[in-house]
Swiss-Prot record:
The keyword Transferase applies. Catalyzes the formation of 6,7-dimethyl-8-ribityllumazine by condensation of 5-amino-6-(D-ribitylamino)uracil with 3,4-dihydroxy-2-butanone 4-phosphate. This is the penultimate step in the biosynthesis of riboflavin. Keywords: Riboflavin biosynthesis, Transferase. This is 6,7-dimethyl-8-ribityllumazine synthase. Gene3D superfamilies: Lumazine/riboflavin synthase. 5-amino-6-(D-ribitylamino)uracil binds at residues 22, 56-58, 80-82, 113. Pathway: Cofactor biosynthesis; riboflavin biosynthesis; riboflavin from 2-hydroxy-3-oxobutyl phosphate and 5-amino-6-(D-ribitylamino)uracil: step 1/2. The gene is ribH. The lineage of its organism: Bacteria, Bacillati, Bacillota, Bacilli, Lactobacillales. The active site is at residue 88. One of its GO terms (cellular component) is cytosol. InterPro entries: LS (IPR034964), LS/RS (IPR002180), LS/RS_sf (IPR036467). GO terms for biological process: riboflavin biosynthetic process. (2S)-2-hydroxy-3-oxobutyl phosphate binds at residues 85-86, 127.
């Protein structure tokens, strides 16, 4: 039986990051977590490109453009959608998650889902670097691991 796993060796990995500006007080912390992790794992700063979009709904379009460019080994998508008093939250969360998944499947590169979908601002804050860790950092680590797993499977 063969078992395959990725590792956290960041040799020659190029990363695209798409960040939503809406709820920037949260998303900027997710971005900081992702960048800190990538630097800690020795991803070269020149191999990281960040694109800011107005909100979470716009993330899939830019992630798709990045994937089609073939410049990146992985794409990290960061946003924060916080439930309000209308059904808008449900539509945005559903479409963003479907869009990101579809891009990954179509492009066959890792597109990491770092879009927080929370009921409260407090829950978002917890996931952006306090009690529940930093989902941006987790996505960066997952991106490196997935790139290496794909490289292993393609070898």
């Amino acid at each position: 039986m063969n078992t395959y796993e990725g590792n956290l060796v960041a040799n020659n990995i190029k990363i695209g990051i798409v960040v939503a500006r809406f709820n920037e007080f949260i998303t900027s912390k997710l971005l900081s977590g992702a960048l800190d992790n990538l630097k800690r794992e020795n991803v070269n700063e020149k191999d990281i490109e960040v694109a800011w979009v107005p909100g979470a709904f716009e993330i899939p379009l830019i992630a798709s453009k990045m994937a089609k460019s073939k410049k990146y080994d992985a794409i990290i998508c960061l946003g924060a959608v916080i439930r309000g008093n209308t059904s808008h939250y449900d539509y945005v969360c559903s479409e963003v998650s479907k869009g990101i998944a579809q891009i990954s499947l179509n492009s066959e590169i890792p597109v990491m889902f770092g879009v927080l979908t929370t009921d409260t601002i407090e829950q978002a804050i917890e996931r952006a670097g306090t009690k529940a860790g930093n989902k941006g950092s987790e996505c960066a680590q997952g991106a490196i691991e997935m790139v290496n797993l794909i490289r292993t499977l393609d070898a």
